[in-house]
Amino acid sequence: MNYVEPRHQRSERDKAVTHRFWFDGLVQCASWAGDMNAKRWSMKSSQEESSERAEFAGTKSYEAAMKLVMKGWKKGREKLVSNVEAIALKKEMVTAPSFVYDVAGARPEVPLAIAGDPCCMWDANPLLSGQAPTHRLFINVSASCRWDADHLMKWGACILSVVDSLESQGNCSIEVNICQANRSSGGQVRSEFIVRLKEAGQHIDFNVMAFAIAHPSMLRRVMFGCMERVTEDHAEERMGSGYGRPDELDLDVLGATLYVPGIDKCGIDISLFKRQPVEKIFPRVMEGFVHMMEGRTFQGEEL
């Protein structure tokens, strides 16, 4: 398949080399990662078709994963949408007020005034009446093998529900990107991949989002394929016997205003994903977004 080459940046700091690749869409990324005519590693786990790899990656082959990228992951889309709808039914968790009460305002709320409440006047929510800010969201799709597809689906549904809620209420407009990073055990070489999924102001395409955020093949086929194409600076040899260790990305380099870490580093225990329905997990994810919009990390730490 023909594709446009991604933008490639090479940087070096303290004898550690980073290769960073920027993609304008999921199809471009998957096509580049799957190009077997290009120079790549001798290890090709992304293309492996054993029964063990099929179970681990969620697809029998790279071609099967590519088909989901091109035509959509129907089962995943349906499950993602149902999870998002389940969250949306919990209106109190996602809906910001369209007006705010105070001691002064445009008009009174009569029942409150009769009851003697001093905060009985209301105005339009300033956030909604002003110009909505634009955010650049980056979601790290790194995940260790202990997370299965159902866990990733719940995680992705919660993130997309926050994005959908904030945009539909006019609180902000959000550009959505996924990213992934890996490094050698000694940190001498790193590779980073950034894929834009949605421009600010565009509607959420659940076909694209379901595969990109919740399918194991996004990491274990497509992103592994991306890693296999990083051949400069003896990357394969320096990674050791595998694909290195998952890593986080630098917010300043990304130009991110919102950054969701890999699910292993999100601060939410895996037991919650195993035991609880998605609407019970959502408040924790919403809390993470509140932290980020206050200028802190997803986990609530100071930047």
Region roles according to the model:
Residues M1-A157, S161-L303:
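Acidic, low-complexity intrinsically disordered regions
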